[in-house]
Amino acid sequence: MTAGSGVVHSELPTDDFLRVGGRMHGFQLWVNLPASAKMIPPRYQGFDAQELRRVALGNGGEVRIVAGTVMGVTGAVQTTSPMTYAHVVMRADEEVTWEVGDGHTALVHVFDGALSANGHTGRSGQMMVFERSSGTIVLRTERGANGIDAVAESAAAAGEHGVVAQALLLGGQPLGEPVVRYGPFVMNTRDEIVQAFRDYEEGTLVRGR
């Protein structure tokens, strides 16, 4: 979803999930728009899981690419500035290579299991932040690679699906602009925030319908 000049929305589970129940997890990522694009018309891009473009790994793992390019495959989501958003699902003894753009911020957020990224250990709940320079980030799940016992332990506890690690690859070009956030609004100046609240209260926030 691109909020742009303004959008009012709600987020709910599917009817089937509400009826049957269970456990689900997800990530909500806020990406700042450049000042020049703050007031573009709002839009929504929806994709089912099976529509995401993927790269198959050697032992049954995969990279699900939402936006940007990883291992030669480009995601379907269109963005206003260059960025990468991918879901990595790795089994034992697999490797993912990610070419990071010059000057881009690059993050690897591990949310299940453990892996190594350029030789650094990443365990569940940890985020690795890399220097803003072009280059290659290599993710591995080799058993005991670089003395990483956590990867070997994850492999031993992988269970029937054999998944050793899951992580998000997140990267983008820094905008270098001021950020002012209050409530649900993110703008560049305090005056713009005040105007956004005024528009909402007056019912003129949502434009470009």
Residue ranges and their predicted role:
Residues M1-R209:
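Jelly-roll (double-stranded beta-helix
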